[in-house]
Regions:
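Flexible, glycine-rich active-site loops centered on histidine and acidic residues
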Residues: 11-31, 100-183, 236
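C-terminal helical cap(s) of enzyme catalytic domains, especially alpha/beta-barrels
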Residues: 133-144, 152-159, 237-244, 313-337
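N-terminal beta1-alpha1-beta2 module of alpha/beta enzyme domains
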Residues: 1-84, 209-210, 224-226, 341, ...
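Conserved, mostly hydrophobic/aromatic
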Residues: 45, 49, 81, 111, ...
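Hydrophobic faces of well-ordered beta-strands that scaffold small-molecule active sites
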Residues: 6-12, 53-55, 88-94, 117-124, ...
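N-terminal small/glycine-rich loop or linker at the start of catalytic domains
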Residues: 2-30, 129-134, 183, 188-215, ...
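Acidic (Asp/Glu)-rich catalytic clusters
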Residues: 2, 43-47, 78-86, 112-116, ...
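Glycine-rich, proline-tolerant flexible connector loops at the mouths of alpha/beta enzymes
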Residues: 52-72, 231-236, 308-321
């Protein structure tokens, strides 16, 4: 299908999408969380031409048994990656089921400042009841209750990002004033499990509002910039994208590619001996690089981008960099991000006006 060029995102948490991916990694297990490892994966993805990197997270181990994966917090890793990259966007997963929106807004606004406007946020949720005890909070039980927490949390975070107008920081030596207090605004929100009073403690992010990504099944589409849509086939993805109601849509695609040493099927079978690759209802390509390029070509016009979940980063990322992305760029099926641009610009999203400044301008115009 023809359509605008795709934007490409890559999930880089752990050693890959498969829970036993570490068994085929080229590094020793104790190097997974090393600064060199984190920086090298990010650099390889940026050099390949990905527009966005995402980093999964959670307060509990993702599984039990011998294939439990350790991780450093996604926001901390994202901040580290921001300092060692210059073009690619970075979006950590931050669940809102139990986290305080005030602290989430501060962390993510800080990330946007550190990255000079390249930050995003993948909204997620904590589904396991054990997570509540980590936060010292009552269990949020049921999908509807978790959705309310996410929806209310996103609303508050967005309002906090706007609680500082763009020119609130004046740094006037002549008047000894650092802030224009009239351009700071009081947020007054009362939810079921928390309240937020007052402005943020971090100035408005460079992008105004970070790019917010998430599943429209969990967060209302009008609160998202990018819907992450799933489906086991092209028809299902098309239906999900059409129903998302968001400015942009990205298809979720799990990937296992043929390599010089083994076919994709052999690689998957090797890992399946240790743990199953869970079915998350996503498109899944197991096969050649050419086949993946063809699939992504079919997604043009259906979605605005794709987020790839490689089976094993150390094996699949080199194949993506060498055999998949170059022909996509050559045919203009996908585009590289441009130096000096924000993540919103890369995704074709306008920088939003500050809600308080816009309201004041409307009042003055009357």
């Amino acid at each position: 299908m023809s359509g605008p060029a795709l934007r490409l995102a890559l999930e880089i948490d752990g050693d890959g999408a498969h829970p036993a991916a570490w068994r085929r990694a080229v590094h020793s297990p104790d190097q997974l969380l090393s600064p060199r490892r984190v920086a090298s994966v990010a650099a390889a993805a940026e050099n390949a031409g990905f527009t966005l990197l995402t980093l999964d997270d959670g307060v509990l181990p993702p599984g039990v048994g011998p294939d439990v994966v350790g991780r450093i917090g996604a926001v901390e890793r994202a901040a580290f990656i921001a300092a060692s990259t210059s073009v690619v966007g970075i979006a950590p997963v931050v669940p809102l089921t139990y986290a305080e929106p005030f602290h989430v807004s501060s962390q993510l606004a800080s990330l946007d400042h550190i990255s000079v406007g390249r930050a995003g946020w993948v909204v997620s949720e904590e589904t396991r009841p054990e997570s509540a005890s980590v936060w010292g909070r009552p269990v949020v039980d049921g999908a509807a209750a978790r959705a309310r927490e996410s929806s209310g949390g996103v609303e508050v975070v967005r309002e906090l990002w706007d609680s500082w107008e763009d020119d609130a920081v004046i740094r006037s030596v002549a008047t000894s004033r650092y802030l224009d207090r009239d351009r700071l605004h009081y947020v007054d929100f009362t939810g079921d499990t928390y309240t937020v009073k007052g402005p943020a403690i971090v100035p408005r992010p460079p992008q105004g509002q970070l790019v917010v990504l998430g599943s429209p099944d969990r967060v209302p589409g009008d609160q998202l910039d990018v819907a992450l849509v799933a489906g086991r086939d092209l028809a299902a993805v098309t239906a999900s994208a059409s129903a998302a109601g968001t400015p942009r849509t990205f298809a979720e695609v799990e990937v296992a590619l043929d390599t010089a040493d083994a076919t994709a099927e052999e690689r998957v079978a090797d890992l399946e001996r240790h743990a199953p690759w869970s079915d998350r209802g996503r498109l899944r390509h197991i096969g050649s690089a050419a086949g993946l390029a063809a699939l992504l070509g079919e997604l043009r016009g259906v979605v605005d981008g794709v987020r790839l979940h490689p089976l094993v980063l150390d094996e699949d990322l080199p194949e993506l960099s060498r055999l998949v992305l170059p022909p996509l760029f050559e045919r203009r099926y996908a585009v590289r991000p441009l130096p000096g641009a924000s993540l919103r610009t890369h995704l074709g999203l306008d920088r939003p006006a500050n809600r308080y400044a816009a309201a004041a301008a409307q009042e003055d115009a009357r």
